[in-house]
Every structure is written in structure tokens, then in C-alpha cells.
From Swiss-Prot:
It catalyses: Endonucleolytic cleavage of RNA, removing 5'-extranucleotides from tRNA precursor. InterPro entries: Pol/histidinol_Pase-like, RNase_P_comp-3_arc, RNase_P_p30. It comes from Methanopyrus kandleri (strain AV19 / DSM 6324 / JCM 9639 / NBRC 100938). The lineage of its organism: Archaea, Methanobacteriati, Methanobacteriota, Methanomada group, Methanopyri. This is Ribonuclease P protein component 3. Consists of a catalytic RNA component and at least 4-5 protein subunits. One of its GO terms (cellular component) is cytoplasm. The gene is rnp3.
């Protein structure tokens, strides 16, 4: 059984044709691409996700070398709205992320086993955005804390330096506390996609070791998707069992 190595994790198609994004992922040698919509928990329209699923079914006729899966990222203002949105979206997606930053949302996300990723917990914070309690919850519930590379590509000058510093804060914290961590592209346009080798080089420039790059870019995405395919979902995509 072939083991997949190149994951385009959390690639957004809110404002771009999903087929165009999938073809771009194929051109850059990705083997698995998770196409996502960003949805507001308080104003959730589940038909948006159903549309994405139908688009992905059609994509399979045009893209053969990339396994394309549906996902979503929830943005919420309250923990209650987040929990309700998780309940409605979880059965439809292979990847469920929550946009972090607000301490109460960070905590609610890592408290819920149905959540795969807590994205950018540092948003709006002068530090990595995780306290001792949130770290313990992430380890206990096996919720991955995500490093969002797109937040680097959309910044310059002092804002870019700030973002690099927050990623390094998270890396240092992760080395001490050993909580689940992964890396996502977060691209919202095909032009924001970069090759897997470029992802690896970028992480190494920020101080990641080879073993950390492999663990966060290959082993973590594979485990997330394999677990969800086996345990959580009614919607299935032919070939997902070949995740390795």
C-alpha cells in the first residue's frame, strides 16, 4: 500500500473554483488536498458544505493523481455557537478546523474531540496563545494545534517579523510540552500554494528540525485523515483508505 507524503492541508475555496485549486495542487505534486470553506458558526449555512461535496465529486473526473477531500474551518464568537456548528458540520468533512485567537474559543476547540485543528491560536495575542490548561486539553483530546503558513505570506515588515516570532514561540512551547502539532497551507488562491519542498525549506529556516518537519507535515496529516476516514464519517471518497 502506497503511503502518501505530500498533503495540501486546509486549502480554501471560498472565493476560487475548487477544480482550479485541485489542479494547482496536482501540478505542484501534492497527493492529497483538503479543500475547505470558512464558515461563521453564528450564521452557518450547511448547504454551503453540501455544495462543496458535490463539487469534489465532480472534480474526480478531472483530477486523477490527487485525492481531494472536503473540510471546513469554523469561525465563532461564542463557545456555544461553536459547539452547535461542530455538531452540524462534523459528519460532512474529513477535516474540521476552528479559527483561534480568542481564549474562550481556543479552549472550546481543544476541549472537543470532534475538532481536528485549532488554527492560529496566537491571533491577536502577544504570545503563542496557549496556556497550561489548553495544552493539557490538546494532549488529552488529541486536538492538533496548527501552524498556518498563509499568515506568513500575507504579511511584510514588522507584521511578518511578529508572525515568525509567534511561530517560533509555538515551536519552543511544543518542544517543552509535546502537544499535537501540524502545519497547514491555508492558501486561498492557487498562487498561494507552494511545493512540499518549499514548505520544508521554509520551516527549516524558522528553526524546525528534520524530524519535526516530517512529523508535522506528513505524519500528523496522515493520522488525522486516516482516523476520520475510519471512525467519524458517513461521507466517503474512494481511495481514502490508501492513506497508509
Amino acid at each position: 500500500m502506497r503511503v502518501s507524503e505530500n498533503f495540501a492541508l486546509r486549502v480554501h475555496v471560498d472565493e476560487v473554483d475548487p477544480l482550479r485549486m485541485a489542479l494547482a495542487a496536482e501540478r505542484l505534486d501534492y497527493e492529497i488536498a483538503v479543500l475547505c470553506l470558512e464558515l461563521e458558526a453564528e450564521r452557518l449555512n450547511i448547504d454551503d458544505l453540501r455544495w462543496l461535496i458535490e463539487e469534489i465529486r465532480d472534480i474526480r473526473e478531472h483530477v486523477e493523481s490527487v485525492l481531494v477531500l472536503p473540510g471546513c474551518k469554523l469561525e465563532a464568537e461564542s463557545a456555544g455557537a461553536l459547539r452547535r456548528a461542530i455538531r452540524r458540520t462534523r459528519p460532512l468533512v474529513y477535516l474540521l478546523a476552528v479559527g483561534g485567537g480568542d481564549p474562550k474559543i481556543n479552549r472550546a476547540a481543544v476541549s472537543d474531540t470532534r475538532v481536528d485543528l485549532l488554527s492560529h491560536p496566537e491571533r491577536g495575542n502577544p504570545h503563542a496563545g496557549l496556556g497550561k490548561y489548553e495544552i493539557e486539553l490538546a494532549r488529552e483530546k488529541w486536538t492538533y494545534v496548527e501552524i498556518d503558513l498563509s499568515r506568513l505570506f500575507r504579511r511584510e515588515g514588522e507584521r511578518l517579523a511578529w508572525q515568525v516570532s509567534r511561530i517560533r514561540d509555538l515551536l519552543r512551547l511544543r518542544r517543552r510540552k509535546r502537544f499535537p502539532t501540524t502545519v497547514a497551507l491555508g492558501a486561498r488562491d492557487p498562487l498561494e500554494l507552494i511545493r512540499p519542498k518549499q514548505v520544508e525549506d521554509l520551516l527549516k529556516l524558522m528553526g524546525f528540525e528534520d524530524s519535526e518537519v516530517k512529523e508535522m507535515c506528513v505524519e500528523a496529516p496522515r493520522e488525522i485523515l486516516r482516523w476520520n476516514a475510519a471512525c467519524k464519517h458517513v461521507f466517503t471518497v474512494p481511495g481514502v483508505v490508501s492513506l497508509g
